[in-house]
Amino acid sequence: MKFEWLFLTIAPCDAAEPWQLGFQDAATPMMQGIIDLHHDIFFFLILILVFVSRILVRALWHFHYKKNPIPQRIVHGTTIEILRTIFPSIIPMFIAIPSFALLYSMDEVVVDPAITIKAIGHQWYRTYEYSDYNSSDEQSLTFDSYTIPEDDLELGQSRLLEVDNRVVVPAKTHLRIIVTPADVPHSWAVPSLGVKCDAVPGRLNQISISVQREGVYYGQCSEICGTNHAFTPIVVEAVPSKDYGSRVFNQLIPQTTGEA
């Protein structure tokens, strides 16, 4: 039990956990930037909370009706007017600069990605297409990803988060994910990767990611898409670059060949 607790404290958190309050561990620079921005804004939030609380407590203490039935009237205070104008203007500036920097960096698209993957949302499963790989009949490598029913889960697998076919990607490689639906609006969201891209009918949205460490990352559809909206999870498995080719060709290609 002791070793299990130690493992849970040092192991990355890449899936939703019961009673979870914080973020999942970052696996991309984008998610790390989101976490850092949250901490920076939270610092200013604490400052404002302490300052406003002090003013309220001081006002309640010094202007109690029993001690001072006639409150002191301050007609004008130049210093107070200047301070309460300058500081509320400076704080949003310190928040806006890193916010816009992160926002624009999230919209940047890699010009020449190493791999392009197309994620197509359905009711209620997903189809993934590796556009860089073609089979013998010149068709792109394509496979479907369905939720594993609760009765078929193996020991250690997460309920409503595991799929039969994972998205296998190489770690520390620039990837482009193209997201689109086949029917109604969907969304492709993986918290550990800092990714949430809406799938809008008739449009192709794209995002660029670079997974910095090996692991298995879980996500879900973040757009209400119908009755089984909660049963369309996303599982991304990042493997070392040297193992990526064998994983794709040994696991995915036989599946597509069998379906054909």
UniProtKB/Swiss-Prot annotation:
Domain of life of the organism encoding this protein: Eukaryota
Residues holding Mg(2+): 223
Topological type in the membrane: Multi-pass membrane protein
UniProt-listed Enzyme Commission number(s): 7.1.1.9
Keyword Membrane attached: yes
Binding site for Cu cation A2: 221, 223, 225, 229
Family: Belongs to the cytochrome c oxidase subunit 2 family.
More about this protein: The gene coding for this protein is probably silent. Soybean nuclear genome encode an active cox2.
Name of the protein in its database record: Cytochrome c oxidase subunit 2
Gene: COX2
